């Protein structure tokens, strides 16, 4: 679209994208196969959303001008299937967290679930000794148990994913006589992060570690070991100034150049 004598322009696009041939590692029988697993292109995905772009020459005077441009996108993606008639795969665990403690993985990719889904225990507080409690079977308001005793039956898909739904880029350009200033902002919204720093350095349990102040402040009630649960799942939203450019264009005597 173009409006106001081309001072405002942009576009709005909607999309649905289907992907196929996603690579997976599948178990196969011995024989006839030579190895117990095989890599195959089987998985399918789907994404949908929109992209909005706008450019606006907001101010035009003899000495001063201001223009801005913005791009905003919204996307949701999910894995449709990891299997077909020949190869079957229920899910794939994400990369596990490292030592010390080796608490396991915080993400799982499974049929008909959003890409980037978090999978783990639901936090239910702490016991008298400060050990993390979880909801048994992931049912909030039900029975609780020690997080260290949790098993696969207690894990559920947690709220939010690690993939941003919204992405924003916003550029601004100011000019005054021979000077110009450009500011570029970038942001991502609608996603979660598993705060690994809080899990490893924000708890008091390991003596001698260089800890965050949060170990003795907001996390002071936790005295036991770390457990992958939604207590450490936090909003990842951010908007930051990504780049600043300042320029000066001197007036040159063209006679000198010639």
Where are these regions (language model features)?
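Extracytoplasmic gating/loop element in the C-terminal half of outer-membrane beta-barrel translocons
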Residues: 117, 130, 186-258
């Amino acid at each position: 679209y173009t409006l106001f004598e081309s001072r405002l322009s942009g576009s709005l696009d909607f999309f649905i994208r289907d992907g196929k041939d996603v690579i997976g590692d599948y178990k196969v029988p011995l024989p006839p196969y030579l190895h117990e697993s095989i890599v195959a292109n089987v998985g399918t995905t789907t994404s949908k959303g929109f992209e909005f772009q706008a450019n606006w020459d907001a101010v035009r005077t003899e000495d001063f001008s201001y223009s801005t441009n913005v791009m905003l996108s919204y996307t949701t993606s999910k894995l449709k299937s990891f299997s077909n008639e020949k190869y079957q795969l229920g899910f794939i665990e994400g990369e596990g967290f490292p030592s010390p403690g080796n608490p396991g993985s915080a993400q799982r990719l499974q049929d008909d679930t959003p890409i980037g889904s978090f999978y783990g225990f639901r936090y239910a507080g702490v016991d008298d000794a400060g050990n993390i409690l979880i909801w048994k079977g992931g049912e909030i308001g039900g029975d609780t148990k020690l997080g260290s005793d949790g098993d696969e039956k207690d894990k559920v898909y947690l709220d939010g994913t690690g993939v941003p739904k919204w992405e924003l880029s916003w550029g601004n350009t100011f000019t005054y006589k021979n000077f110009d200033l450009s500011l570029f902002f970038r942001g991502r919204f609608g996603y979660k992060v598993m705060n690994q720093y809080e899990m490893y350095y924000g708890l008091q349990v390991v003596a001698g570690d260089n800890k965050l102040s949060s170990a003795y402040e907001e996390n002071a009630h936790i005295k036991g070991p770390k457990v992958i649960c939604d207590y450490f799942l936090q909003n990842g939203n951010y908007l930051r100034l990504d780049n600043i450019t300042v320029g000066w264009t001197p007036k040159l005597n063209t006679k000198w150049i010639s």
